[in-house]
Amino acid sequence: MNSLFTAFRRNLLLNPNPHRNFFLHRLLSSSRRSSPLIPVEPLIQRIQSPAVPDSTCTPPQQNTVSKTDLSTISNLLENTDVVPGSSLESALDETGIEPSVELVHALFDRLSSSPMLLHSVFKWAEMKPGFTLSPSLFDSVVNSLCKAREFEIAWSLVFDRVRSDEGSNLVSADTFIVLIRRYARAGMVQQAIRAFEFARSYEPVCKSATELRLLEVLLDALCKEGHVREASMYLERIGGTMDSNWVPSVRIFNILLNGWFRSRKLKQAEKLWEEMKAMNVKPTVVTYGTLIEGYCRMRRVQIAMEVLEEMKMAEMEINFMVFNPIIDGLGEAGRLSEALGMMERFFVCESGPTIVTYNSLVKNFCKAGDLPGASKILKMMMTRGVDPTTTTYNHFFKYFSKHNKTEEGMNLYFKLIEAGHSPDRLTYHLILKMLCEDGKLSLAMQVNKEMKNRGIDPDLLTTTMLIHLLCRLEMLEEAFEEFDNAVRRGIIPQYITFKMIDNGLRSKGMSDMAKRLSSLMSSLPHSKKLPNTYREAVDAPPDKDRRKSILHRAEAMSDVLKGCRNPRKLVKMRGSHKKAVGEDINLIDDINERNGDAGDFE
């Protein structure tokens, strides 16, 4: 195992393309012998025969962008000494590169998790003669700023354009959709509502059709973030300003139905369903699909099957929106044979199973620990011409991560790279989680480097996990560097992560670095709240003082034992003492488990 990881580590250092390497082929041979065969479909043929581009997609900007220019600016932005602002703009001037809309778009795509750096790039590009801002790039800038919760800067950009002659060309309904969704995601309900109301008053987007679309976006954004009650109340309020005969659209009902089900409020969902029928709003396939998915989400698969029968009686077309939730619900309930039987019924439909159907089955077979069953589903979908996606393989990585099968997980990763697949952020998070939990720090750092080379920056969860592992291994300079890089990318680390590094630095006498860390943290908006379980232990002095504290508790317990005659009290005290000592010993491991785990990504 160690030699296998050593080979991979050397391979990553020497070759950015690990699939062109002897070690990889040896690993692939090992994977075929040591684990159930997980088929991986090569993408070489697809690359040689590109599909006809979809006219609805964003035009391919990469083709018109100089790779040299893109690489030069990307390397500059990844330099840890570069900070957003005028100094970065001066450094960009020194490159001599003339920015284009396509180049800036490509940078936004590549460095999406570094919003403040990208804002400086945008300001630099905008000042260049001949640079013409496009509506899609403007919306990307607004989205990037809102993602970093720099709403004030985003609004200043919007207001500047609204007041100018180019406002109607740049500030569109899509701009306000970005603002509304980002506010909702940040839990800022009233601000999301005010963004919608401002859009209603802005003449270029206040047409009735656009206003209804924005209302639906607002309700959808609030419901998806769990603010269904607020969405319902606002709909009632705005309904009072409409014509007396106004009835919410079926889409609005669908959004609220989905919201109540997502919030697990079954009574409210069923009440809304009755109101919809009372208002003679005709349900659509989406409505029935929402009901079925909602019941399945709440583990009421049998009721979902009854709704399916109701659809049949209404002679409505039954498609993937109906079958997929039922198949997933049966799988989640462990009724995998019934899920396969339902898929057989799905085959007779015109549309047939989709990638979502197969991914659901793969997910639930992996959850059940049936890796051969999941592999069979994978072979089935390939046979039927459905290409597996990164999401498909991520379910296998979840299985390997959960069951500490690091070698099998790494073997699958190599096979995907060799076949031409591009792992996504979740793939790397799961791989890093496996390696961190297995204590393979060197390999984890190399995989982290490989992830960045592929243009994927680690998110908060991945960054937290790496920093906590570095702290546990007392690699404090590396932990500080990861913390600093995260802040530069616009990520605000958790306060408990700061405390772990700070305590470690101070215990090692690294006071200068501890001061730099404190200065960095004080510049960020953050909460100083720590989990109650860990507050005393994290803030407590380490090593010698902790041992003194434990000895003091032991002496106190000894004194109590001498004078206590009640056996029940002794049992209670003993349990309390064991718990306290256990918390002292296992503190850092507990922190890592709570803050480092990715959870169950769907």
From Swiss-Prot:
Main location: mitochondrion
Location of this chain's protein in the cell: Mitochondrion
Any GO BP: regulation of seed germination
Database matches in PANTHER family: ATPASE EXPRESSION PROTEIN 3 (PTHR47932), OS08G0290000 PROTEIN (PTHR47932:SF63)
High-level lineage: Eukaryota, Viridiplantae, Streptophyta, Embryophyta, Tracheophyta
Domain of life: Eukaryota
Family assignment from sequence similarity: Belongs to the PPR family. P subfamily.
Keywords (A to Z) from UniProt: Mitochondrion, Repeat, Transit peptide
Gene Ontology CC entries for this record: cytosol; mitochondrion; nucleus
Keyword Transferase found: no
Organism for this UniProt entry: Arabidopsis thaliana (Mouse-ear cress)
Protein name: Pentatricopeptide repeat-containing protein At5g11310, mitochondrial
Spans of repeat PPR: 134-165, 172-202, 211-241, 249-283, 284-318, 319-353, 354-388, 389-423, 424-458, 459-493, 494-528
Transit peptide: 1-35
